[in-house]
Structure formats: structure tokens, C-alpha cells
């Protein structure tokens, strides 16, 4: 008798993706973040769905509808804070997942990597629009500042911004369309995830050594399903500790004040996971230059397959590249800190130096150090 798992047209797709999938025998815990991102997406879609049942996307009632969810809906506070902090967990996993890809040379899987960068952009857009929905002060002013950046585009900028706003300022039309997009984008993300996995399974997973592992594969189930289950346990534990003990730790107190177009908050800043990009944006005095730097700070990831000049794929056996990689991590943490600081001395110059270093490390230092290591191999 044939196994249904291997013959059923639908179940066999799942079987080839999650059960009988040949996986390298030596992949470490850094390979857990793919499944954790899938879990984060599922949590966000489910909690978001329940929030959408009670939320109203109207400027007069949006803020009070969120208050109503927290006060009157059964476990509404839990759903709301799981959704808000779930986004933070999502981005922590995203950054670690991308960092893993950079460290171990996973970007040489060209299609998988580029789809991943597109996914990063779409998730960032989704998170930005979600931040606008509670219609607090930071929601309103964040939306105003970020959408206004598009006015830097020559010729069509102003028209484009007013088209996105649906008027001459961020108002009811903006909130309604942001809610619509925020609702639909996670499903587009889910579809892109399928494409991401499709391309990954064309080549198989990379591994810490960066060497071809075709001769040493093990089935995904039970080895990596049990390993993923541990990651899931730790992620849910971290999320619930955050949600139940300090749900507002990563939020902005200004967002508990209803949006007021006549009163600007002293420091407009996005959520913590956008601060590095915000710092890069602010470090350039020119508006268009800042916008280009902001976009390029993420888009630069697409250049990594082209900038890879090392004879080895992974950084596992490249101590010089490892040093530069950790410089980059430290620089990103510095940028994140600067993004949350006011625009004054000495933060301005620190931000400018950190932004310059960010692009220098990626475009110049990593390839140069790789070439030096290639030379050292011959000695």
C-alpha cells in the first residue's frame, strides 16, 4: 500500500517541503528563524483579524475604538498587545535572519535572497501603515513626516503625496486606505513567502560551513521539526513575557494622546525597528539625498551577491571578514540609538559618521577584506 503522504496531490507538496525535505546535517540554531518568521506572520494575521473585527478606520472613532478594544472586548488588551509586540518580535527575527544570510553567504542563492529583500520592504511598509491606525499623536505625525518624504521626488513628488493622502493633509481618506492596505499586505507577504520557499527548495539550504552538503543530508522531520519546536517555545515565551509584564516597553507614550494636527510632538520618531533607517535619513541635510539614502540602506542588500569576491562562501573560516561583520552590527546598533535621539550636537555628527560607515562597510570594507583573505590563502 502506498503512503498517502507521498501520493496525495496536496499532502505530497507539504511532505516535500516540511517532512521528507533533505536538509544539511550541520545547520545551527541560526537556521531556526525562517520557521519563527512564519510563526510571527501567523500570529500577526490572526491577532490582526480579531482586532479588525472591532476597529473602525475613521479619524473620529479610530483612537476610541482601540481604547474600546483594550477596555471592553474580552481579552482585547491581550490581542492588541500581542499584535503590537508581535511586530517587534517579527523584526527581531527578520534582522537575525538577514544577518545570518550575510554571515554565512546565503545571498549567493540569488532569487531566494532578492525575494527576501522584497519581503523585507513589504513587511516594513505593512508595519509603518499599522503604526498609523491607532491614530495617536505619533501615528499622525509619523504618517505626515514619512509620506511627505515622497514630495522630494522631482516633478511628480507633491502630486504623488497628495494622491497618497487623498487630500491636502493626512486625514480620514489616508487612515481608511492605510487600514485597507494594512489588512491586505500580510496576505501578499504570505504569498511571497511561498515563492521564497519555492526558490529555496530549488537549491536546498545553505549550512554554516558554506560547503556543498549534498552528500550529507538528513530528513527535515523529525530532526528539524523538533529543533524548530524549541525555537517556537522560546519565541512565544519571550513574546508573552513582553506582553504580560511590560507591554508598552517598546511603544511611544505620545501615542496615548489622540492625534492633533495643531500640536506637533517635540520628537517625532518611528518604532524602534525603523530607527536605523530613520537615522540614515536624518543624517543627510538634503531632502532627496536623505530619501535616496533611506531606500538604498535596504536596497543595498540586493548588491551583496554582486559584491561577493571571496573564494569562500561562509564567513565561518574568515576572521577578518568576521571582524568587519561585527563592526557592521555595532554600527547598526549605534544608528538605532541615534535615530531615537533629538537632532542636536553631538548626535548629528555621530549619526552622519555612523551612516557613512554603514555604506563604507558594505560597499568597500567587506569586498576589500575578502580580497585580502583570498591573498592570504595563497601564503
Curated annotation (Swiss-Prot):
It is a multi-pass membrane protein. Belongs to the cytochrome b family. The chain crosses the membrane at residues 33-53, 77-98, 113-133, 178-198, 226-246, 288-308, 320-340, 347-367. GO terms for cellular component: mitochondrial inner membrane; respiratory chain complex III. Heme b b562 binds at residues 83, 182. It comes from the Eukaryota. This is Cytochrome b.
Amino acid at each position: 500500500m502506498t503512503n498517502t503522504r507521498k501520493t496525495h496531490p496536496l499532502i505530497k507538496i507539504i511532505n516535500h517541503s516540511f517532512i521528507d525535505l533533505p536538509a544539511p546535517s550541520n545547520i545551527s540554531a541560526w537556521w531556526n528563524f525562517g520557521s519563527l518568521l512564519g510563526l510571527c506572520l501567523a500570529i500577526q494575521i490572526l491577532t490582526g483579524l480579531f482586532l479588525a473585527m472591532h476597529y473602525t478606520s475613521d479619524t473620529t472613532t479610530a483612537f476610541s475604538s482601540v481604547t474600546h478594544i483594550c477596555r471592553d472586548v474580552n481579552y482585547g488588551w491581550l490581542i492588541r498587545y500581542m499584535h503590537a509586540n508581535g511586530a517587534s518580535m517579527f523584526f527581531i527575527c527578520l534582522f537575525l535572519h538577514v544577518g545570518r544570510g550575510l554571515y554565512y553567504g546565503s545571498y549567493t542563492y540569488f532569487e531566494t535572497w532578492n525575494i527576501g529583500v522584497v519581503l523585507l520592504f513589504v513587511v516594513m511598509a505593512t508595519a509603518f501603515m499599522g503604526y498609523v491606525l491607532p491614530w495617536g499623536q505619533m501615528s499622525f505625525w509619523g504618517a505626515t513626516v514619512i509620506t511627505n518624504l515622497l514630495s522630494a521626488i522631482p516633478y511628480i513628488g507633491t502630486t504623488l503625496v497628495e494622491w497618497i493622502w487623498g487630500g491636502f493633509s493626512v486625514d480620514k481618506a489616508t487612515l481608511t486606505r492605510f487600514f485597507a492596505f494594512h489588512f491586505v499586505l500580510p496576505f501578499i507577504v504570505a504569498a511571497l513567502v511561498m515563492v521564497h520557499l519555492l526558490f529555496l527548495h530549488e537549491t536546498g539550504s545553505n549550512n554554516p560551513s558554506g560547503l556543498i552538503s549534498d552528500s550529507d543530508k538528513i530528513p527535515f522531520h523529525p530532526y528539524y521539526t523538533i529543533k524548530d519546536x524549541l525555537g517556537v517555545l522560546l519565541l512565544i515565551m519571550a513574546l508573552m513575557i513582553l506582553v504580560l509584564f511590560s507591554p508598552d516597553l517598546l511603544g511611544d507614550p505620545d501615542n496615548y494622546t489622540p492625534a492633533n494636527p495643531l500640536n506637533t510632538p517635540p520628537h517625532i520618531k518611528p518604532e524602534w525597528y525603523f530607527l536605523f533607517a530613520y537615522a540614515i535619513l536624518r543624517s543627510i541635510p538634503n531632502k532627496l539625498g536623505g530619501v535616496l539614502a533611506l531606500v538604498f540602506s535596504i536596497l543595498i542588500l540586493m548588491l551583496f551577491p554582486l559584491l561577493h569576491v571571496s573564494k569562500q562562501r561562509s564567513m565561518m573560516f574568515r576572521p577578518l571578514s568576521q571582524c568587519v561583520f561585527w563592526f557592521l552590527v555595532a554600527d547598526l546598533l549605534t544608528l538605532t540609538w541615534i535615530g531615537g535621539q533629538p537632532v542636536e550636537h553631538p548626535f548629528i555628527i555621530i549619526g552622519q559618521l555612523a551612516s557613512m560607515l554603514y555604506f563604507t562597510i558594505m560597499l568597500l570594507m567587506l569586498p576589500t577584506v575578502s580580497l585580502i583573505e583570498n591573498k592570504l590563502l595563497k601564503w
